[in-house]
């Protein structure tokens, strides 16, 4: 096994053991699955900090009065047809309404997204993103960026509050 992977696993395990415990009453299995899925599809090609940052945005939205108050409702927010299918390009998180399958087939990326979700739920926040509520890929320029305060860029994602 690759030494870097073993060291990363040991580091993450140590962080989880010594971090504050996540209340099972606060986040049920479905909520954790929604967070892992969003991190996987929105940022699996990003560095680990970038994946945690995406998770930070999701939890910050859950805590904000401007957004739904559960992880799944935040991740699945958007416009839907009457039959319940999300309208393409009208979702808060693009993967949810891109018309593609939500099957997580890359085992290593799934494990990394799971590790990121665990750390986010344990309270880890990427420095400078404590109040982040928005992000986008750096290859697009949404109209809403004019109304937001830039916080920082991590990998190919740009974060705002």
Can you name each region flagged by the protein language model?
Residues 1-2:
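N-terminal secretory signal peptides that target proteins for export/translocation
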Residues 5-14:
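Sec-dependent N-terminal signal peptides
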Residues 15-21:
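C-terminal segment of classical bacterial N-terminal signal peptides
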Residues 21-161:
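Bacterial extracytoplasmic/cell-wall-associated proteins, especially those involved in peptidoglycan
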């Amino acid at each position: 096994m690759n030494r870097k992977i073993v060291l990363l696993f040991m580091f993450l395990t140590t962080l989880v053991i010594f971090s504050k415990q996540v209340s099972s009453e606060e986040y049920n299995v479905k909520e954790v699955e929604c967070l892992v899925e969003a991190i996987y599809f929105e940022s699996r090609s990003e560095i680990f900090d970038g994946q945690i940052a995406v998770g930070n945005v999701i939890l910050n939205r859950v805590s904000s009065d401007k957004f739904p108050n559960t992880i799944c409702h935040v991740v699945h927010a958007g416009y839907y047809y009457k039959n319940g299918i999300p309208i393409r390009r009208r979702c808060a998180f693009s993967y949810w309404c891109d018309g593609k399958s939500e099957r997580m087939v890359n085992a290593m990326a799934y494990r990394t997204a799971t590790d990121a979700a665990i750390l986010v739920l344990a309270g880890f926040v990427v420095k400078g993103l404590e109040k982040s509520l928005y992000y986008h890929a750096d290859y697009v320029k949404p109209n809403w960026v004019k109304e937001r305060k830039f916080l920082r860029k991590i990998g190919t994602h740009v974060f705002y509050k």
